[in-house]
Amino acid sequence: MGQSSSTQAESKSESFLAKPSGACCLKGTIHEGESRGTWETIADVETYITRPPEGKENGNILLYFPDVWGMFPNGLLVMDAFADAGYLVLGLDYFRGDPVWKHRKDRHDNRNPDFDYEAWKRKHTAFADKAVPKWVDSVKKSYGTSTSKFACVGYCFGAPYVCNELKGDTVTVGAFAHPAFLKEHHFQDLKKPLFLSCSEIDHTFDVPSRRRALDILQTNKKTFHYQVFSGVEHGFALRGDQNDPYQRWVKEQSLAGIVSWFDYWLSQ
């Protein structure tokens, strides 16, 4: 979706509701499991593609926008889980093989003192802002059919791309979990249903920001569902400790809620 120069200037001057990815985005654990998808270059961006098991296809397509950890094992396994629910899933590596964990393994990792996190974010945001619309168009042309519908999901860094798609015509429904980089216009401009999966503890999308986002959604009569889990932090839907029964349950419930949301709206 393109923006006029005046609209771009206004959006740049807005303050963030969900702040840019910060130190909380560097925390997490790597999950065990073998991903089953394949890789393909689409619109000059490496893309992970995972398909539903035979006989479980629902005919619909899910676009996946990753968090700052990029195409790491947890993300691939989550995409496979969406495929298990019947979706053809495609996720693009807009970090181009340069996820944040290559530079910092966690928020206390200072082994690379020259790493400039702010410059890293600026570099990859600039690329993703241009690459995502082209990539979505290419996916639609290559994989869309006369009967297929599109959904999209984004984690952290990927949240604004979900909102951008939900103001256009390609995607029918969307969802994000523990978002970053969101401003008021992302909520004001929505034309399609949005699922918000959030954590009680989140310095990126804190309580006042969540309340403001909900106020915008309600005032503008948007279609949405708000889910919040107590006792977990930013990153819960992708990077929680799977040896902790509650964190595992939260991750699974977030995904199940998103799938149910997609299934409903894509059946209408």
Model-derived features: where do they sit?
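N-terminal cap/leader regions of alpha/beta-hydrolase-fold enzymes
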Residues: 2-268
